[in-house]
Amino acid sequence: MPLAPPSPLKAFAAFALLFVVYQSAEGLGGRVLDNFAVQAALMVAALLGGWPVARWLGWRGYEAYGLDRRRTSFAILAAGLMLTLIVKGAALAAGLSAGIASVGAAPGAPGVLAGAGLVAGAALTTFIPSVAEDILTRGFLLRAIGVRWTGPAFVLASAALFTFNHIYRFDWGISEQARLFCCGLAYAAAAWRWRTLWGAVGLHWGYNLANALWERLSPVSIDDVVAGRWLTAVLHLILLAIIVALPRRAADDAPDQIPAYHS
């Protein structure tokens, strides 16, 4: 843990570096070159680049972003993952009952090995970008820059940054911006309440993983995209309420670095 927070200029430069690398994955790899390998390599670089950036800011490594190695933090990760998968199932049921989604032809069921490979591939390809974005939009604010946040201020700032980070969706309309902001509220609240970025990763990764598996395995399709976004926003507000209602992490179990810069 650094003895003092980094200067505003140094913190901004560190953030800008990670931001550019992260955005280049979709911008350069996905849109300009249309090359999945380049896109994947840049996303991995965005994740791995967090380590030298943290060192430059005076930290030992990924602890700068709240990615500690405590067993309870990994339990929080697993619980968040399961909770989001349940919420995604609730969204599916609500979408069907509201006429937002419909059931079509069922995709062919993969064999055991193919199915395991599909799940493993989906888990990996959603985990890396989820953690990279969580570092950028939540972990950086949570700990790395040393700001003395209050809980509501951190959650709002992180949700706004998460929404802004989707720069290629600015023209998708207000429904998408609202969906992103509500998702950001829930994910940031999890990171703050349990004093670990793994809380946010569990929810964020779970949501992305559920989407990836849904696209490949589910016969359900979204008929009203805009209504689907609003439904997702509402469900994430419910998820936010659940997070707030759950008990806080015990102070003696939270990572030591949190109290230094947080009220």
Question: Could you tell me what each predicted segment is?
Answer:
Residues 8-16, 37-41, 74-82, 119-120, ...:
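Hydrophobic alpha-helical transmembrane segments
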Residues 10-59, 67-70, 75-80, 230-234:
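Alpha-helical transmembrane segments in multi-pass membrane proteins
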Residues 28-35, 62-132, 142, 147, ...:
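Juxtamembrane helix-loop-helix connectors linking adjacent transmembrane helices
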Residues 31-34, 166-174, 222-226:
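Membrane-interface helix caps and helix-loop-helix hairpins in membrane proteins
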Residues 56, 205-263:
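C-terminal membrane module of polytopic membrane proteins
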Residues 132-157, 189-196:
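Membrane-interface helix/loop boundary segments of multi-pass membrane proteins
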Residues 154-162, 199-211, 259-260:
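Central hydrophobic cores of alpha-helical transmembrane segments
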Residues 175-229:
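Functionally important transmembrane alpha-helices
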